């Protein structure tokens, strides 16, 4: 399902934030020298040397259980890197580190800075704004986002809602450049294939969100999306959509149905669908912070959004969970894999 995307614009997107306009100049004015010095100091504060961050102790605390290349448990310690990270040597003749084949493999930027990046995302800061705040190239911020997507791609698999469960669909437009129009140039009305359907559900403790295709969803798509994420016998609070029938009958759900027209004009406190409506509002705000993203990556954004909204609710605890997940369920993504072929975003 190609939903359209946005291409990284030009080489300026990958320009190093470390550079100033006067790096090759010999005679600077007092103003230029002041600005250059101040800018460089702030850059270095944001980008400390790895050996100065103390992260070697963190990385070394994750002791590998097997070789990331061959899977063998026959390996031994073999000294340290210049940054103090434990090196291992396997019987297959491969050397590796605790970070090998994880999202932190071959990194040049400290995990501490990646932590700040995650905290910004949790606050709905766009990656473009984060790029400027942390003085990173835009491509670096984009690369980190793809690594985060990689880490969270299976995140929702184990989430099961129970008890009172609110479920409803919302819609998000395809990217403007990919809008399908009528022959006269006008837009299609209603829930056309220019609208991407997102199914969301919550039990007020956790949420799940899944892309269900374009236009109005079907019973099959809704069933496939939520069947493994709602406990049998739960109570489903939803609107009177026929697309929910198969899900309700298969899981033997108690159904509380409401007509959308009967809920119009109600205060939030009186609206029985308010718990899921609030999720939809937050989801739109989150997506709008990244409005030019490739819609083919929409499910990745759903995984990230649910991670942001679900427990633990303390942001630093979320970062700790991601770091642990990165080492315990390692997945890697090389920079060249992401940008070498000039992928669409």
Question: What are these regions, as identified by a protein language model?
Answer:
Residues 1-345:
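Residue-level recognition of single "structural anchor" positions
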């Amino acid at each position: 399902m190609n939903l359209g995307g946005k291409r990284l614009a030009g080489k300026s997107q990958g320009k190093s934030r470390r550079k100033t306009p006067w790096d090759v100049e010999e005679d600077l004015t007092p103003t230029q020298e002041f600005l250059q010095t101040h800018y460089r100091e702030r850059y270095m504060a944001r980008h400390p040397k790895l050996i100065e961050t103390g992260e070697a102790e963190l990385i070394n605390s994750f002791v590998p259980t097997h070789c990331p290349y061959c899977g063998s448990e026959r390996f031994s310690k073999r000294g340290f890197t210049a940054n103090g990270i434990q090196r291992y040597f396997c019987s297959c003749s491969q050397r590796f580190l605790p970070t090998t084949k994880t999202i932190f493999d071959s990194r040049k930027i400290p995990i501490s800075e990646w932590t700040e990046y995650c905290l910004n995302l949790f606050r709905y800061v766009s990656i473009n704004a984060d790029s400027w705040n942390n003085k990173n190239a835009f491509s670096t911020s984009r690369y980190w986002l793809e690594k985060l997507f990689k880490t969270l791609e299976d995140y929702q698999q184990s989430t099961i809602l129970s008890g009172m469960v609110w479920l409803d669909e919302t819609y998000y437009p395809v990217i403007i450049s990919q809008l399908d129009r009528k022959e006269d140039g006008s837009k299609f009305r209603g829930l056309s294939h220019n609208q991407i359907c997102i199914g969301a559900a919550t039990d007020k403790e956790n949420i799940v969100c899944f892309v269900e295709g374009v236009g109005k969803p079907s019973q099959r798509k809704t069933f496939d999306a939520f069947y493994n994420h709602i406990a049998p016998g739960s109570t489903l609070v939803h609107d009177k959509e026929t697309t929910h029938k198969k899900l309700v009958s298969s899981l033997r759900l108690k159904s509380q149905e409401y007509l959308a027209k009967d809920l119009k004009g109600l205060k939030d406190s009186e609206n029985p669908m308010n718990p899921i409506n609030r999720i939809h509002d937050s989801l739109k705000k989150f997506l709008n912070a990244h409005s030019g993203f490739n819609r083919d990556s929409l499910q990745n954004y759903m995984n990230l959004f649910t991670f942001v909204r679900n427990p633990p609710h303390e942001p630093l605890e979320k970062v700790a969970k991601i770091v642990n997940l990165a080492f315990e369920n390692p997945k890697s993504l090389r920079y060249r894999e992401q940008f070498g072929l000039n992928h669409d975003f």
